C-alpha cells in the first residue's frame, strides 16, 4: 500500500490523467444507463406503482394489458376466485394548452393505487389525478382540462408519482368515464395467487394468468429500446478495458528500469503486483465515485420530461463493473511486470 501510494504521489499528473479518463468513461456509462433506465420506466413504471405481480387478462399469445377484453360473465367468474376489483384501461386524448396529449386512463382500485406525489385521488367523475410528467406540459393541481370527445371538464386533484405504461402517461379517473370509451381493456392485479386459484382462473374460457415479466416482455417499445442501449453500455465497458490496458501497459514499460531496480534490491514480484492492483483500484474507485456524484447532481436538475433514472442499484453495478474491467484491462501490465528481468532492466546484461 505504501509503495502504491508513493508512486501515485510521485507521478501525480499521470495518475490524474488516467483518473480523468476513467471519470469520463464512467460519466458516459452512467448517463446512458440512466437513459436506458428512464426509457424502461416510461414503459413499465406502472408495475412498480400498482403493487402486484400477478395479472388476470384475456387469453392471448402475447398478453398485453391494453388488449385484454373480459366480458361481464368472465369478470363474474374471476371475482368468485379472487377478491379483487378489476382495472379498466382506455386511451384518452387530453387537450392541454392547445396541444393534444395521448394518455392511458385507469380507474382507482383499492390496495393497487399508484403513489401520489401531491394532492389526492379522484373522488368523483369530474376529478382526475395525472402522472407527474404531464406537469412539463403545463398541467398542474387545480387546473381544468378537456378530453377529446367528452363534454366534461376535469379538475386535476392529484399528481401521480412516475406512473407510465408503454410511453403513455397514466391518468386516474372515475371508472364510469373510462367505460364511455369504445375500446376498454379489463384486467386484474393481485399479489397472492395460489396454485389452485391459478388453475381455476386458467380453466375459465378465454382467460389466463400472467406475471409482470410476461406483460413487460410483450411491450414492443420496451424490447426495441433496451437492446441497443444495453449494447452501447457493453461497448463502453469494452472500450474502458482497452483504454486502461493501453495506459497501464505504457506506464509499465516506462517504469521498466525502476521495476528492475526494485526487484534487484529484494522487492518481490508479488509485492509489485499488489502495488499495481492497489493503484488501479484506488484511481478507478475515485474516478467512478466522482462521476457518480456528478451524475446524481445532474439528475436532480434534469426536467421531469427527461427520461432519466439512476438509483443505488445502478450506481453499485457500475462501480463494481468498472473495478473488474479495470483489473482485466491491466492484465497485460501484469504479464509485463512478471517478465521484467532485474539485470537486463538496469543494463547489467550488456
Curated annotation (Swiss-Prot):
Pfam families tied to this protein: FtsX (PF02687)
Keywords, comma-separated and alphabetical: Cell membrane, Membrane, Transmembrane, Transmembrane helix, Transport
Subcellular location: Cell membrane
Transmembrane feature ranges: 15-35, 233-253, 276-296, 315-335
Record-level GO cellular component terms: plasma membrane
Principal location class: membrane
Membrane protein topology class: Multi-pass membrane protein
Alphabetical list of InterPro entries matching this protein: ABC-4/HrtB_transporter, ABC3_permease_C
Function: Part of the ABC transporter complex hrt involved in hemin import. Responsible for the translocation of the substrate across the membrane.
Matching PANTHER family: ABC TRANSPORTER, MEMBRANE PROTEIN, HEMIN TRANSPORT SYSTEM PERMEASE PROTEIN HRTB-RELATED
Subunit text: The complex is composed of two ATP-binding proteins (HrtA), two transmembrane proteins (HrtB) and a solute-binding protein.
Family: Belongs to the ABC-4 integral membrane protein family. HrtB subfamily.
Protein name stated in the entry: Putative hemin transport system permease protein HrtB
Amino acid at each position: 500500500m505504501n509503495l502504491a501510494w508513493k508512486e501515485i504521489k510521485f507521478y501525480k499528473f499521470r495518475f490524474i490523467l488516467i483518473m480523468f479518463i476513467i471519470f469520463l468513461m464512467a460519466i458516459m456509462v452512467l448517463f446512458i444507463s440512466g437513459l436506458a433506465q428512464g426509457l424502461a420506466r416510461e414503459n413499465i413504471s406502472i408495475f412498480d406503482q400498482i403493487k402486484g405481480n400477478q395479472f388476470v387478462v384475456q387469453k392471448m399469445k402475447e398478453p398485453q394489458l391494453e388488449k385484454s377484453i373480459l366480458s361481464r360473465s368472465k369478470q363474474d367468474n374471476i371475482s368468485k376466485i379472487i377478491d379483487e376489483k378489476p382495472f379498466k384501461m382506455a386511451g384518452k386524448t387530453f387537450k392541454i394548452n392547445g396541444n393534444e396529449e395521448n394518455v392511458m386512463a385507469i380507474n382507482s382500485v383499492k390496495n393497487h393505487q399508484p403513489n401520489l406525489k401531491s394532492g389526492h385521488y379522484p373522488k368523483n367523475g369530474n376529478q382526475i389525478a395525472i402522472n407527474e410528467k404531464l406537469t412539463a406540459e403545463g398541467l398542474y393541481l387545480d387546473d381544468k382540462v378537456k378530453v377529446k370527445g367528452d363534454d366534461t371538464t376535469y379538475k386535476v386533484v392529484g399528481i401521480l408519482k412516475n406512473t407510465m405504461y408503454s410511453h403513455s402517461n397514466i391518468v386516474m379517473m372515475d371508472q364510469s368515464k373510462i367505460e364511455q370509451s369504445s375500446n376498454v381493456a379489463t384486467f386484474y392485479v393481485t399479489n397472492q395467487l395460489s396454485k389452485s386459484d391459478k388453475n381455476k382462473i386458467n380453466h375459465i374460457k378465454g382467460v389466463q394468468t400472467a406475471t409482470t415479466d410476461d406483460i413487460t416482455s410483450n411491450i414492443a417499445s420496451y424490447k426495441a429500446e433496451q437492446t441497443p442501449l444495453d449494447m452501447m453500455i457493453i461497448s463502453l465497458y469494452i472500450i474502458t478495458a482497452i483504454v486502461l490496458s493501453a495506459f497501464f501497459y505504457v506506464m509499465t514499460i516506462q517504469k521498466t528500469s525502476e521495476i528492475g531496480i526494485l526487484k534487484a534490491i529484494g522487492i518481490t514480484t508479488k509485492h509489485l503486483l499488489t502495488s499495481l492492483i492497489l493503484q488501479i483500484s484506488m484511481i478507478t474507485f475515485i474516478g467512478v465515485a466522482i462521476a457518480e456524484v456528478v451524475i446524481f447532481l445532474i439528475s436532480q436538475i434534469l426536467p421531469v420530461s427527461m427520461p432519466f433514472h439512476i438509483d443505488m442499484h445502478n450506481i453499485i453495478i457500475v462501480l463494481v463493473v468498472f473495478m473488474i474491467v479495470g483489473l482485466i484491462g491491466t492484465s497485460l501490465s501484469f504479464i509485463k511486470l512478471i517478465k521484467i528481468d532485474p539485470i537486463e532492466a538496469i543494463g547489467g546484461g550488456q
